[in-house]
Amino acid sequence: MAKKVNAYIKLQVKAGQANPSPPVGPALGQHGVNIMEFCKAFNAKTQNLEPGLPTPVVITVYSDRSFTFITKTPPASVLLRKAAGIKSGSGRPNTEKVGTVNRAQLEEIANVKMPDLSAGSLDAAVRTIAGTARSMGLNVEE
């Protein structure tokens, strides 16, 4: 018989830098999960990613206090900011442009994000990422 699921916890944790301090500790502690066990497993799984890159993770907590987790790809906005070399997006994206990204950068980001996107092709994924870039106030060069 399958284990009974108690909770799903969604967090964004910096790759390779999970520790028991907030937000990880309180979120896992209230469900009785061994926090250090999660931190060690998460850090081991994300060691090949760039350290400090925010990584979404979905933790499934079972009734016997065991857990499994799935890491996702970093948010498109973080990857776009890194590609454009900016600190934050524009407060007024339609009037105030803060940077530029080209097609090659969009394709690179789309390749990274492809497992988490519902796009059927790379071209559709690039268009999705380009829309995110425009909404952040970035110029998109074709």
From Swiss-Prot:
GO molecular function term, any single one: structural constituent of ribosome
A biological process from GO: translation
GO cellular component: cytosolic large ribosomal subunit
Entry-linked SUPFAM superfamilies: Ribosomal L11/L12e N-terminal domain, Ribosomal protein L11, C-terminal domain
Coiled-coil region list: none
PTM notes: One or more lysine residues are methylated.
Annotated PROSITE patterns: RIBOSOMAL_L11
Keyword Membrane: no
Keywords carried by this UniProt record: Methylation, Ribonucleoprotein, Ribosomal protein, RNA-binding, rRNA-binding
Pfam family, one: Ribosomal_L11_N
InterPro entries on file: Ribosomal_uL11, Ribosomal_uL11_bac-typ, Ribosomal_uL11_C, Ribosomal_uL11_C_sf, Ribosomal_uL11_N, Ribosomal_uL11_N_sf
Similarity annotation: Belongs to the universal ribosomal protein uL11 family.
Quaternary structure note: Part of the ribosomal stalk of the 50S ribosomal subunit. Interacts with L10 and the large rRNA to form the base of the stalk. L10 forms an elongated spine to which L12 dimers bind in a sequential fashion forming a multimeric L10(L12)X complex.
PANTHER family: 60S RIBOSOMAL PROTEIN L12, LARGE RIBOSOMAL SUBUNIT PROTEIN UL11M
NCBIfam families according to UniProt: L11_bact
Protein name: Large ribosomal subunit protein uL11
Gene that encodes it: rplK
